[in-house]
């Protein structure tokens, strides 16, 4: 059982330790202390949900319906472009970290945005649902699959909360407007690049 849990834990680690859109959003939320723990909670929940969807064998639906993947990809492109351009605008105009700016984002908006970054990217499904779900087929027993999924979900939770908390602790050091502009610029460029990459992938799916 422990071995199965550890396999899931480290497989998820190999997939999530990348500078993707979801990680950037969690990082930025932590740096601005904008409901960063809520963002981490939503991100962790979505990852766990997708992992268990894959482990329980629902991945075949996503694989067998190309139109679903393409539609999700198109929505994801628009989502990433919107937030990427928003970050570039912040890099140009600046973003002051203050009490007022922390309150500017409502709880509902925070949850919806976190859901968007967690669910509107086909690559997330390919990693969590298809890859992890596919790997879990080596375990014939449903109990083993559960522990495998629990291991993968545990790493996601540790990672997102750790990232949000560390970013929050470092926010005072990076609260200088110039530093925030640089962070926004880097985030914006990466998000736009991810949108372009996703667009190329979507074209290849036709």
Label each residue range with its predicted role.
Residues 107-128:
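Selected transmembrane alpha-helices and immediately adjacent juxtamembrane segments
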Residues 2-70, 129-147:
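Juxtamembrane transmembrane-helix termini in multi-pass membrane transport proteins
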Residues 7-11, 42, 112-117, 151, ...:
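Alpha-helical transmembrane segments of MFS and MFS-like solute carriers/permeases
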Residues 34-110, 166-169, 186-189, 196:
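Membrane helix-loop-helix hairpins that form the core translocation module of multi-pass transporters
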Residues 196-206:
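Juxtamembrane boundary at the C-terminal end of a transmembrane helix
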Residues 9, 13, 17, 48, ...:
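Hydrophobic/aromatic residues within the transmembrane alpha-helices of Major Facilitator Superfamily
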């Amino acid at each position: 059982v422990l071995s199965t849990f550890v396999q899931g834990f480290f497989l998820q680690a190999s997939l999530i330790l990348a500078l993707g859109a979801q990680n950037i959003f969690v990082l930025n939320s932590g740096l601005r202390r904008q409901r960063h723990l809520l963002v981490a909670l939503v991100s962790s929940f979505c990852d766990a949900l997708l992992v268990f969807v894959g482990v329980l064998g629902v991945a075949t639906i996503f694989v067998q319906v190309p139109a679903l993947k393409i539609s999700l990809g198109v929505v994801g492109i628009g989502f990433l472009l919107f937030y990427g351009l928003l970050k570039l605008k912040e890099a140009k105009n600046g973003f002051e970290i203050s009490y007022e700016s922390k309150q500017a984002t409502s709880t509902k908006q925070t949850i919806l945005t976190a859901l968007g970054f967690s669910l509107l990217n086909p690559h997330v499904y390919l990693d969590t649902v298809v890859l992890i779900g596919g790997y879990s087929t080596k375990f014939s027993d449903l109990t083993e699959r559960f522990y495998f999924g629990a291991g993968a979900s545990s790493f996601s939770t540790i990672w997102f909360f750790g990232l949000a908390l560390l970013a929050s602790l470092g926010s005072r050091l990076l609260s200088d407007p110039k530093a925030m502009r640089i962070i926004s610029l880097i985030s914006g460029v990466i998000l736009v690049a991810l949108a372009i990459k996703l667009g190329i992938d979507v074209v290849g799916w036709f």
